């Protein structure tokens, strides 16, 4: 079981393993059936099966228990997850866990040679996230994060929810990736709290961390998660104002 933040290289590492051991490589997606899994167990072709558990709710993960507990001679299994939080305990108990260590800024710059500003390496801590950015898209996500942090206290509830329309839910490449947006909000909010001792920014920071953990599970409806996040941020900020 490979554990690490989105974009840290879990899929890349899986492909490297398959290549090094001369195994066929197959990713198992959400369309898999019990019949499919049985057929894989009967195959005589040495194959590395990669299961991204972020795409499966905990109840759905039950279908893999036999597959990972009783693999046949030609079956090799790598499970992937952003964290243990979204993995069924019975799956965890049947797995050998490997955690990807966090990258340093210097390692990221060596791995990802881009023209992005230095600040991008402070905010986004995995190669995959940085590779998904251009200078323009970095500015887009940072501007949106700054708008949330610095203007939420004057926004109406309806205006706060409008931010949800700027997020990419279905491969709309002119919009902002949800995970990148939450990373940027976390950075901007913490920086504002450290600089200005702003209690509202601290509450935005803490709320964002909680919702980042939910977003990392991957099997939630992103638009619903985003609306819940914006609602919560608006409420905590305006509660701070009313108590002031």
Q: At which residue positions do the language-model features occur?
A:
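Charged, glycine-rich active-site and insertion segments that engage polyanionic ligands
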Residues: 1-28, 74, 82-244
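A short beta-strand-to-loop transition that corresponds to the Sensor-1 phosphate-sensing loop
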Residues: 52-53, 79-84
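Clamp-loader machinery-focused feature within the broader ASCE/P-loop NTPase space
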Residues: 1-72
